[in-house]
Regions:
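Polybasic, low-complexity intrinsically disordered segments
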Residues: 1-3
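DEDD superfamily 3′-5′ metal-dependent exonuclease/proofreading module
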Residues: 5-6, 10, 14-220
């Protein structure tokens, strides 16, 4: 992702810079850790959500990591560890909790394959930004830089997420992918409401919850 320091007027920050209070990420690799994480996550009404996956060696993407954040906590759930992910998917499908993602479609595809349903309800910060004057495919790092003034290291973009153990650089990268999502959501949603465009984003998000979007035929 290129960090372009030049902003068009409509791409300026809508609010003053804030510091995200989210704690250091915790890697979840056993059932006890997952149970404790889910207990804390259930008290939140918004969940920052991202995944890491691999496509190169399989037709369908292989889920390698699920990152979930709240205002206070950040968890990296390891699907390659001996975990029952059923309770995690129940949480992701809980409609009392909004899931905040960036460029959500591929993440939703891999979560559908893993859990049998598309998480929801959704808010996609890339879609929201596009209705506020940003380029339609604005990257997460670029949006965070322009909107919040934070710099994100994207050096692990092409890393092998299926290898274990994860390196400290991978853990830091994965955590950064959710660390700013809740702040972005609050920022962008307020701007959308002010411009009368919040309904447009909600319609787009509702369409993303249709499982038919992610069904493919390997024969074609």
């Amino acid at each position: 992702v290129q960090h372009d320091s030049k902003r068009r007027p409509e791409e300026r920050r809508f609010y003053t810079q804030v510091t995200d209070p989210m704690r250091e990420a915790r890697l979840i690799q056993d059932s006890g850790e997952l149970e404790a994480a889910l207990f804390r996550l259930r008290s939140a009404d918004r969940l920052a959500l991202d995944t890491e996956f691999m496509r190169e060696r399989t037709y369908h993407p292989q889920l390698c990591l699920v990152q979930i954040g709240t205002e206070a906590d950040c968890y990296l759930v390891d699907p390659l560890a001996p975990l029952d992910l059923g309770p995690l998917h129940v949480l992701l499908q809980d409609r009392s909790k909004h899931k905040i993602l960036h460029a959500a479609r591929q993440d939703l595809e891999v979560l559908l394959l893993s859990g049998g349903a598309v998480p929801g309800p959704l808010f996609d910060t890339q879609v929201a930004a596009s209705f506020l004057g940003f380029p339609p495919q604005v990257g997460y790092a670029e949006l965070v830089a322009r909107q919040l003034g934070h710099s994100i290291d994207k050096g692990q973009t092409r890393t092998d997420w299926s290898r274990r153990p994860l390196t400290p650089a991978q853990v830091a990268y994965a955590a950064d992918d959710v660390r700013h999502l809740l702040t972005l959501h609050a920022d962008l949603q307020a701007a959308l409401v002010a411009k009368g465009r919040a309904g447009w984003v909600a319609e787009e998000a509702a369409a993303y919850e249709n499982p038919a979007l992610y069904r493919t035929d390997p024969a074609h």
